[in-house]
Amino acid sequence: MELLRQKIENEGIVLSNQVLKVDAFLNHQIDPVLMHEIGQEFAKLFKHDGITKIITIESSGIAPAVMAGLALQVPVVFARKRQSLTLTENLLTASVYSFTKKVESTIAVSNTHLGEKDCVLIIDDFLANGEAAKGLAAIAKQAKAKVAGFGIVIEKSFQPGRDALVQMGYRVESLARIESLEEGKVTFVREVQS
């Protein structure tokens, strides 16, 4: 997605060979025009998959998920990372390790919002090692929901997340695939045109 690549090149900050900071438009300050376009792109990619719900994880996945939900006209459910006074019973849960925060947390979704009749699209802002994605897939599996695929805003292709999800049999659609962050420079995966 060209607009997203431009944003990454112009506003993203490479902090290390592993970390790209995109808080100017994606996961702190949010560019609503970009989010709208991201939602439209995910809707286009998954429009024939019978999506009934989108699931994501709080908080950075919510904006692109809501825009995709709007475009597909389906509800969005987000997994909570923090304990909630109102979310205590009938929970679908999974443990997720965050390499960015160096902490393991339990994510949770109420089983009243996800069930066996659902066909879900899982959306997240980043795909690196795939821990959040696998956690969301585990929650969908507990609900006996079908996973149509993963919509990823930015994929760090040099990390094992995509390969892990593909090996598990999942479809992965990433709007920007980063090959490298070496030497402080973002290098995108060159897509082969057929």
Swiss-Prot record:
Its main location: cytoplasm. Gene3D superfamilies: 3.40.50.2020. GO terms for molecular function: xanthine phosphoribosyltransferase activity. It catalyses: XMP + diphosphate = xanthine + 5-phospho-alpha-D-ribose 1-diphosphate. It is found in: Cytoplasm. Its EC number is 2.4.2.22. It comes from the Bacteria. GO terms for biological process: purine ribonucleoside salvage; xanthine metabolic process; XMP salvage. Keywords: Cytoplasm, Glycosyltransferase, Purine salvage, Transferase. GO terms for cellular component: cytoplasm. Pathway: Purine metabolism; XMP biosynthesis via salvage pathway; XMP from xanthine: step 1/1. The keyword Glycosyltransferase applies. 5-phospho-alpha-D-ribose 1-diphosphate binds at A128, N129, G130, E131, A132. Xanthine binds at L20, N27, K156. It is an enzyme of class 2 (transferase). HAMAP family: XPRTase (MF_01184). Converts the preformed base xanthine, a product of nucleic acid breakdown, to xanthosine 5'-monophosphate (XMP), so it can be reused for RNA or DNA synthesis. Homodimer. Belongs to the purine/pyrimidine phosphoribosyltransferase family. Xpt subfamily. This is Xanthine phosphoribosyltransferase. It comes from Bacillus pumilus (strain SAFR-032). The gene is xpt.
